[in-house]
Amino acid sequence: MALSKKQKKKRRRIIILSVVGVVVLAFGYLIYSYGIDYYRKYYACGGVEIDYYRFPVTGIDVASHQGKIDWKEVYDSKVYFAFIKATEGENFVDKRFKENWKEAKQNNIIVGAYHFFRFNKDGKEQAYNFINNVSLSADDLPPVLDVELYGGNKYTQETKNKVISEIFNCLRTLERHYERRPIVYTNIETYQNFIKGNFDDYDLWICKLCSEPKTLDWTFW
């Protein structure tokens, strides 16, 4: 059956739109796949098999973005300690900190709290934010200062020195208040740029999610 010019034009338009749609979907899938691969490479492991013979004591760190946590289930999963996000910067308090702290203790999980360090904020004021919101008993784990580069920030040597000074001020303020030396949590990049050689007196917690660390001598993983 012969098609009119109008029908041919309409069919050509449908074909073009269909091709464009396929290309857009394919491009979107590539972006999605790349995003998933990037996430898996840097942030997720798809689950880590724990050798309980080598590592009989296991723990987790949590924050509000984990949502509501069933702490009984956590304990039943052989997780015996937890570091819980308490504060960030000079005035932010994690909205689930008190809830997580209370319920973890109720389920016989040993707890510790951590502060997320903001590079552009005063170190002492950040320590006071943590101090004003976290009371530690003798049975609790030491305070943790989470120091990680974020947002693709670049630093000159001058600004690096300023950040290092503020990290030191934060750690010293925490140590004087709690009379316990804090733990420094960081990742490889931040360790190389800010921590290495500057905070050797502090226990170091390196973020290495999916495999045992190879670059540093470590106590446990």
Language-model segments: residues:
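N-terminal Lys/Arg-rich, disordered targeting/topogenic segments
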Residues: M1-I14
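Functionally critical loop-and-helix segments that line ligand-binding/catalytic clefts
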Residues: A2, G46-G67, K72, F199-W221
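Hydrophobic membrane-insertion alpha-helices, especially the h-region
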Residues: I16-Y34
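Boundary/entry segment of secreted carbohydrate-active catalytic domains
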Residues: Y29-E88
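Acidic-and-aromatic substrate-binding clefts and catalytic sites of carbohydrate-active enzymes
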Residues: I60-D70, A86-F97, F117-E125, N153, ...
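Acidic (Asp/Glu)-rich catalytic clusters
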Residues: W71-K78, R96-N108, F130-D139
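Short, well-structured secondary-structure segments
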Residues: Y80-T87, K105-N120, P142-V144
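Surface-exposed substrate-engagement region within the catalytic domains
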Residues: L136-P143, V147-N153, E158-W221
